[in-house]
């Protein structure tokens, strides 16, 4: 093992929220992030919610485990989620692979693979995103990018268009106020002196560092103040590879 790095849960409601909406960012150039997936979810209780995710194989999307539901539909090639284009590909999820050690109470091992009903067609607007190797060292201070659909401010309604924001990888000490933060399993991201962050709503989107998906949006403060916590993808490469090989 490599030792490196949308309802709220009632018992977490005073400290953190499931994350994903971009605050302090800018609108992406349409279809410049062809790996992005917009997930429409019907929860186990029957209500609708949404998440982000990203295409890693033509028939597999990677996202957060807390985005699981009774049924999921993946939308690819989306820029404005309210404005359907010819670029869209809408695919049903036929199987959800939550990490076997996922803990919903503390949001550890917050990672899930989604198998699609068929392979996506790769186009200029739909493409895959590479993953890091298992032992992949990331230095604090490095600048990365996160993307998602959602609020551009805590009090604002969700954005219809895909937004992105630059975020700094922080020393794990910056996340010590999150009682269950685990540096081996998670990344601490976002300068607390900046009003740039991701927030509740569109969890599951990627943290992109030099063209590689290094993290998955997991949770943040309820007030959206950074830093925020991402699942560290490199730790889960053996599990990801096992699922992909078997399917």
Swiss-Prot record:
It is an enzyme of class 3 (hydrolase). It is found in: Secreted; Cytoplasmic granule. InterPro entries: Peptidase_S1_PA (IPR009003), Peptidase_S1_PA_chymotrypsin (IPR043504), Peptidase_S1A (IPR001314), Trypsin_dom (IPR001254), TRYPSIN_HIS (IPR018114), TRYPSIN_SER (IPR033116). This is Chymase. Keywords: Disulfide bond, Glycoprotein, Hydrolase, Protease, Secreted, Serine protease, Signal, Zymogen. Belongs to the peptidase S1 family. Granzyme subfamily. GO terms for biological process: proteolysis. The keyword Metal-binding does not apply. Residues 1-17 form the signal peptide. PANTHER family: CHYMASE, KALLIKREIN-RELATED. Major secreted protease of mast cells with suspected roles in vasoactive peptide generation, extracellular matrix degradation, and regulation of gland secretion. SMART domains: Tryp_SPc (SM00020). Its main location: secreted. Disulfide bonds join 51-67, 144-209, 175-188. Residues 18-21 form a propeptide. GO terms for molecular function: serine-type endopeptidase activity. The keyword Plastid does not apply. Its EC number is 3.4.21.39. GO terms for cellular component: cytoplasm; extracellular space; intracellular membrane-bounded organelle.
């Amino acid at each position: 093992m490599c030792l490196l790095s949308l309802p709220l849960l009632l018992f977490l409601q005073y400290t953190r929220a499931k994350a994903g909406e971009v605050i302090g960012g800018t609108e992406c150039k349409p279809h410049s992030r062809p790996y992005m997936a917009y997930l429409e979810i019907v929860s186990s209780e029957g209500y609708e919610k949404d998440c982000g995710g990203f295409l890693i194989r033509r028939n597999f999307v990677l996202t957060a485990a807390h985005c699981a539901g009774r049924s999921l539909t993946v939308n690819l090639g989306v820029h404005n989620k309210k404005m359907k284009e010819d670029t869209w590909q809408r695919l049903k999820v036929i199987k959800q692979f939550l990490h076997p050690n996922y803990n919903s109470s503390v949001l550890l091992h917050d990672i899930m693979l989604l198998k699609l009903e068929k392979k996506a067609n790769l186009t200029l607007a739909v493409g895959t995103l590479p993953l890091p190797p298992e032992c992949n060292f990331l230095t604090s201070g490095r600048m990365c990018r996160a993307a998602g659909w959602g609020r551009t401010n805590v009090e604002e309604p969700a954005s219809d268009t895909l937004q992105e924001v630059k975020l700094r990888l922080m020393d794990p000490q910056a996340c010590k106020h999150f009682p269950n933060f685990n540096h081996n399993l998670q990344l601490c991201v976002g300068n607390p002196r900046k009003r740039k962050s991701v927030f509740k709503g569109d969890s599951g989107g990627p943290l992109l560092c030099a063209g590689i998906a290094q993290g998955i949006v997991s949770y943040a403060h309820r007030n959206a103040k950074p830093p925020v916590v991402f699942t560290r993808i490199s730790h889960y490469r053996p599990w990801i590879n096992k699922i992909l090989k078997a399917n």
